[in-house]
């Protein structure tokens, strides 16, 4: 999206987390849609998640000996919070960033697809006061059996929309 020039208002921030085996550009239809409706969107590229990642040349099979699922479950929500922190630094009024004074980091939404939906739920567990809403599209569950989507939800107050397909068996 084009820079907003001398905007009088600040734009809310959306942090997007992709699904397993994907990367940030895999969901351009969603992130561009959000950006075209007045949101500043930051999309994660989570380490070790894309099918095309080759760090040491080894083959990693889901759930296999070299699977990093548990580590990714711990890291992905932290990646999302890290992006909020980064934008907060970039958006500081008076700074020299193109985002200075243009992004309202007190109005953040988290969104994600599949494993990114799990990351969104897990990031909500931190109860970051900057996060005002979340959208989880076909969220996966924790394979380690702990954390997001595995705890009592009665004390949660952040509005969340969960989108699922009735035929989704994953």
Kindly give the residue locations of the regions a language model identified:
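Domain-level recognition of soluble alpha/beta enzyme cores
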Residues: 1-14, 26, 36
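The feature captures the conserved acid-bearing segment of alpha/beta-hydrolase catalytic domains
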Residues: 4-6, 132-170
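Conserved alpha/beta-hydrolase "nucleophile elbow" surrounding the catalytic nucleophile
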Residues: 18, 112-114
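Active-site machinery of serine-nucleophile hydrolases
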Residues: 25-63, 70-73, 77
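Alpha/beta-hydrolase active-site loop
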Residues: 59-105
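Short glycine-enriched nucleophile-adjacent loop
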Residues: 88, 117-128
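Residue in the alpha/beta-hydrolase core beta-strand immediately N-terminal to the catalytic nucleophile
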Residues: 97, 107-109, 133-135
